[in-house]
Amino acid sequence: MSQPVYALNLFNVANRDEYLAYSRRSATEVKAHGGRVIALGKFHEAIVGDMAPRNVLIVVEWASRQDFDSYCNDPALVDLHPHRVNGTDNYIWHLFDKLEDLRPILKDEA
């Protein structure tokens, strides 16, 4: 059985019109490919860390890595993804495996 993955998207909007062209269609396409936006946020404050802040946060839960890949590689969306690229800058896009708890990370390797 495939495990869900979470896509963390952090970015700045660089071109409003380009990003609007992306966002008008992306929500429907994300859902059609097994994704669900679970968090949207606007930068508020840096507490700890040395990463340059990004203005936008989006977290998408994908049913599986395969669903994420199908969204990224679907030939029917070849005209969509360039709007994201051209509408943003300083983009960070990381995938995280879903965990029920931290035991897989904290277990003793000894």
Language model features with spans:
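C-terminal structural segments of small proteins and small subunits
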Residues: V78-T88
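Short S/T/G/P-rich N-terminal loop/turn motif that feeds into the first structured element of a domain
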Residues: M1-L77, H94-A110
